[in-house]
Amino acid sequence: MHLFINMIFLINIVFIISIIFIERRNPQTTWAWILILTFLPILGFIIYILFGQNITREKNFKRKILDDKTKQKYLNSFKSHYKLDNISLKYKDLIMMNFNNDNSTYTQRNDIDLYFDANSLFEEMIDEINKAEKFIHMEFYIFKSDEIGKKILQALTKKAKEGVEVKLLVDSIGNSIHKKDIDKLKAAGGDFKIFFPGFCKYINLRINYRNHRKILIIDSKVAFLGGFNIGDEYLGKDKNIGHWRDTHTKIKGLAINDLEGRFLLDWSYANESDLDIDLKKYFINPHSTDLPKKIIGAQIVSSGPDHTEQQIKNGYFKIINSAKKNLFIQTPYFVPDEPMLEALRLAALSGVDVKIMLPGNPDHKFMGWIANSYFESLLNAGAKIYLYEKGFLHAKTIVADSSICSVGTANMDIRSFSLNFESNIFIYNEAISKSMEEQFFKDLKVCTKVTLESFEKRSIISRIGESITRLVSPLM
């Protein structure tokens, strides 16, 4: 027994040396791992094996990075260029950065609808699935075989039987579709793949890297992207959660091309196959006469651990720094790194009306403590913090100056920025941004405002929880 413990301590020391001298992580993450490996030697060893290896990360993504670069050549042939309208012109540096970081095409011929309620969203998704003629491509983090999940699976299976190409890609941890439902889809001619499958669901050396995207694309005519997963709880049917408040988009137009490209790259990686595609089948011709007449500037931006740049985080950062009047943020998990925290503080100190809305009843207590640990610094800078009390807030949105907004799958936390595979749409449009603002202020009516006075009255347990969880926040 003593020999085993000594071996674990020795291995932990090797890991610590690796973290400091070989992997060259950022200082916050380095100290967090050193604390865990020092004070929780046996448990820390297990946690590091599952969640901490950058060396494994490089090995995991070497092929994916090469594949993405090669396959991007297919997609570049459908890139298009526009003169910027007045709103987009204000954010030309952000547009250029998104393009340079992620090959994200700026498009204008788009029509975008917002959904804040799962009932109307799922109804619309099923309706569009039923109208599919060529293909249905679906990629989701969580997909359950409950009532709504089965309805969507039945719709997919029906279309597969009709000869429509159906591809369903799910995350290995988030997926809980019953095998019999998968077998029915496959028997009908549909395709089903799991992203990063492991030996079993929770024993996986790649468990730290989750495909958090929520994408549905149909015939290149319509696409859906946002925060809603597939399950009854998002309809408010979980009594422990209650009302589920989220934001999703329905997209028509050229922005779909980059979203389709993202799906095909993820699918080919999960399928371990080359990308052999018919561009005319999957992508919209920029010169098509069937494009929306509206001029809504948009970019699809994706990020993940297979890239050194944190593309979505960089986009958020630019929006925060460019805000002149107001900045409204909704996120279920709030774990900013130091540069992001400082950007928010500086915006507030500069006179920008910074409002941040978080869940009043977080689904994980320790995530609530971590978020709380940033409150005092933000409040002292003049930022305003609100806790949503009508169920659970899961929306991942940012809107600034009634002119630019972003909606998608990325939370404002370190995990979404660096460890998860995420996708967001950046929208350069006053009407859409104002709709986002209107919903934000509707949500404010069921929020509790956090003040310095009320925050200082929190319990001793909360204070201790905040102090401890803040130490490991870079790993969350």
Curated annotation (Swiss-Prot):
Matches recorded under SMART domains: PLDc (SM00155)
**Record InterPro entries:** Cardiolipin_synth_Firmi, Cardiolipin_synthase, CLS_N, PLD-like_dom, PLipase_D/transphosphatidylase
- CDD domains with a match to the protein in the record: PLDc_CLS_1, PLDc_CLS_2
Q: Which Pfam families match?
A: PLDc_2 (PF13091), PLDc_N (PF13396)
Question: Which BP terms in the Gene Ontology apply to this protein?
Answer: cardiolipin biosynthetic process
Cellular location(s): Cell membrane
Which EC class, in a word?
A: transferase
**Gene3D superfamilies named among the record's database cross-references:** Endonuclease Chain A
Record EC number: 2.7.8.-
Which keywords describe this protein according to UniProt?
Answer: Cell membrane, Lipid biosynthesis, Lipid metabolism, Membrane, Phospholipid biosynthesis, Phospholipid metabolism, Repeat, Transferase, Transmembrane, Transmembrane helix
Tell me the membrane topology, using the record's own terms. Multi-pass membrane protein
Domain PLD phosphodiesterase stretches: 207-234, 389-416
**Which function does this protein serve?**
Catalyzes the reversible phosphatidyl group transfer from one phosphatidylglycerol molecule to another to form cardiolipin (CL) (diphosphatidylglycerol) and glycerol.
| HAMAP family per UniProt | Cardiolipin_synth_Cls (MF_01916)
Similarity annotation: Belongs to the phospholipase D family. Cardiolipin synthase subfamily.
Q: What is this protein called?
A: Cardiolipin synthase
Source organism per entry reads Clostridium perfringens (strain 13 / Type A)
